[in-house]
Amino acid sequence: MTASRDPYPSRIVCLTEETTETLYLLGQEHRIVGISGFTVRPPRARREKPRVSAFTSAKLDRIVELEPDLVLGFSDLQADIAAELVRRGIEVHVFNQRSVGEILRVIRTLGGLVGCERAARALADTLESGLAEIASAARGLPRRPRVYFEEWDVPQISCIRWVSELIGIAGGDDVFPELAREPLGKDRILADGLEAARRRPDVVFGSWCGKKFSPRAVAARPGWQDVPAVRDGELHEVKSSIILQPGPAALTDGVRELHRIIGEWVQRHA
């Protein structure tokens, strides 16, 4: 009797890190034939898989040479890449998760795409439980700091929805909740950079999309000298790889780092 052929995609290219990390966590890394050059999680992925894309660009000919039966992308920023690959006859699935709930749904969906629905549900449930534990601990904090999270410095861009939600889970309050609902970065640009100072954040998180955050530069901005976060030295970098990647990293290391810093702020200001 001949063994049945695996009916699921066996040559997957991941254009962003979160799908790579998720497939590794599901034990499905053998299906991956190409990854993003920005991938750092898990570290061994960079050693094991060829890097075929940046974030808004890709080595299209190289991807075609890999003969993928599925390419996984993310958001409108990769729409042009996806369209060109489709024109070349390649199947593409583009996720568009912007919230914590949508990140969990993507994990479950990805499990279905590769035939490991049960493992994916278990992973998502574990991540959800971890978030609930942090939220429970945060509810016990005597104070909640006002938090400004900056994704980019020039122009100043405030945080996307999943980051805003994770700030809330971790024990803080995003000072720009109305902007967090905007899915596109261009719609989260602060028309007046001083508005962030006027909202008087107690804590500033900087995660400049791979560029090193400079607390000194933020503190030196005109009009910022009386901001509580500047006055108290509460300007903190959070690595982009653990918070701006809408996948397992943000729901584990990212939110834990936010919670740790917020907890330390509470201790200093109790």
Residue ranges and their predicted role:
Residues 1-270:
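N-terminal ligand-binding lobe of clamshell/alpha-beta domains
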